[in-house]
Amino acid sequence: TLMFEEEVVERRLAFKPDPELGNLCMGIINDVRIDIREVPLLDDKGVESTWEYAGCKFPVLVIEFKQCKTDANPKDRYYTFTAKPVTTLNKKGEPVEEKTVINIIQQVYGQLRHIANQFKGLKGYPVNAGKCPGLDYAAPAKVRCEQYLAFFEYFKHLLVGDDEKNPIYKNVKLFMKLVADYNTHKFLAFPSFVNRGFVERVIPGQSPSIEFEAGETIHLAKDDTPKN
């Protein structure tokens, strides 16, 4: 007899800006991993997919943060930052302007370098990691996926170090600036551009230097404050 238990899926709460920190958040990195997603050649209807990464092993760098609890905010709260290979074709299959592709890649690099820089000087930080692997945005999709995998592994190594069981990031507190998503204003996320910073290692006795830029807000659409 086959017995089936219903899987209980809990909705994870999002980070909540802390008024005591000027609406910044304080959190730690909870997990860093690379997910490899096999992209099917056929879509849901059995039609050959026109997406440029169809048939590829598509790497996704996942950095999961957990908010530090306070008396006013005692619940488990998470924020997940992901970095993916940049698409070079639009939905019509037309090439995206080269300048735009380069800007998006540099934006992702800037975000990852900024996060990794917060761990410089800590025990285990790989000072001999060398240069970040390059990306040829004009290469075939499968080659690009391999290059992105090396690119993401480089940054994972900067955050984790050589000892996966005792990662550099473990229990390192960070000030974090999460803002309403620029396009939808429906969720909080890191800003696309580093500017004066969106993450900063907490140093006892020092106030954060991160500030909100003009146009950045924590207020979400249909509501004045993040839910829960």
Task: Cite the ranges covered by each PLM segment.
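Short beta-rich binding modules
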Residues: 1-228
